[in-house]
Each structure stands twice: as structure tokens, then as C-alpha cells.
Amino acid sequence: MHQHDEGSSIVITKPSGMEIEINSGAMTRLAGVSEMLSGSTGIHMAVATVPPGRCSTAHYHVNCESALYVAAGKGAFLSGEELEIENEIAFGDFIYVPPGANHQPVNYSKTEDLVLIVARNAPVEIVVELENLGRKDC
């Protein structure tokens, strides 16, 4: 459910009204601000969840910058041409991903979800999955 304030064009999306987006590997993403939900044209926000011991597929975004905030959990953020760079991430960290940057979030916990708040500067993203790169064991 979301509420639309006609006077100011403010849209409030409740958790029950979030838009189910793509699955990328084991990662799921629910949008709260999107073109469909709020009519946004220059921003998008979502919550991405990576279950314990799992990861997204390796990928990059063609048309947008992304900013992520680690809201819960810990893991790694793989990046680089061959995903050879592994940075540990944990609650409170911010991550900037430019267009075209290969990346893959990985949840190393055996018990906790890795929860990422995702913002990007385009209402619809164009994603290229990198089937031959990244972790395959998660």
C-alpha cells in the first residue's frame, strides 16, 4: 500500500505495498520509490536482501549510478574487471557503484541476512549479468 498526497505529490510506500523487482542470484529486491509506485523519473530506492551464505549474480548497471547502505549484516562486496577486489562490508557502510562497474555482494553470515538500501539515479536500470565472473558457490 502507498499513500499519495495530491497537494504535494508526496508518495509514502508502506512495506506491504513495495514493488517486487528482480532476483539476482539469491538476492531479492523490493522497491519503495520507483517509476511505477511513485512516478519518480530521476531516483529509485529499494531494499535488497541477500540470505545467509548466498550472493547475487555478478553484474553491472549500464545506465545508472548506485549508492548502497548496509542496513544489516556483513559480508563482502566484490568488484574490479574480474571481480578480483574483495572489500568487507558491514552495518553502517556506504558503497558507491558507478555505471559499468562489475560487482557482486556476498553474505558470509550463516545466520543473518545482508540487507542493503539501494538508491540509483534512474527510474529503471539496465543490468548486464556476468555469467562467467564472480562467486558461483553461493
Where are these regions (language model features)?
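Conserved hydrophobic/aromatic beta-strand scaffold that supports enzyme active sites
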Residues: 45-49, 67, 86, 94-96, ...
